[in-house]
Amino acid sequence: MGMSRISLAINFCLLGLAIAQNSPQDYLNAHNSARARVNVGPMRWDDRVAAYATNYANQRKGDCRLVHSGGPYGENLAWSSADLSGTAAVNLWVAERPNYDYNSNSCVGGECRHYTQVVWRNSVRLGCAKVRCNSGGTFITCNYDPPGNYVNQRPY
């Protein structure tokens, strides 16, 4: 009986951790931490952008393919066959930082455009959403207003 209580307590702690890493503030903290490292001002949560992200994430539940929405916002997508927190998704995008060469304003050695969208100086409003795919995986989208990643422009 004592062991099952411990197991239940651990499960609740893990559930709380997973929920905490998916709040608007957690998405903002992950983005703003990366932005601060390159002296870019913070983003703020925008309910209109978040509603757009939620609507699109719900459309992707059936197949969870990494297909961009084609909407009016900048967009980063993430998918995992297991559970993925919003914070972990942002950290995946930020992990592309070593591939961005500021001097040539290009990606070298791999993908970097998810990272450059995270730190795009003019993108100041953020909205993100996470859904559980019908297949059991996780789909996450973050949308940015105004969008970034314009050709021949530096993110900061």
Name these PLM-found stretches:
Residues M1-S4, P155-Y156:
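A positional/structural detector of protein chain ends, strongest at the extreme C-terminus
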Residues M3-A20:
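Cleavable N-terminal signal peptides of Sec/SRP-targeted secreted and luminal proteins
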Residues I19-G74:
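Short, well-ordered surface patches within globular domains
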Residues T54-N58, W79, N91, A95:
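Generic alpha-helical structural context detector
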Residues R65-H68, A78, Y115-V119:
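A structural signal for short loop-to-beta-strand junctions that line the ligand-binding cleft
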Residues Y73, D83-Y156:
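Disulfide-stabilized extracellular recognition modules
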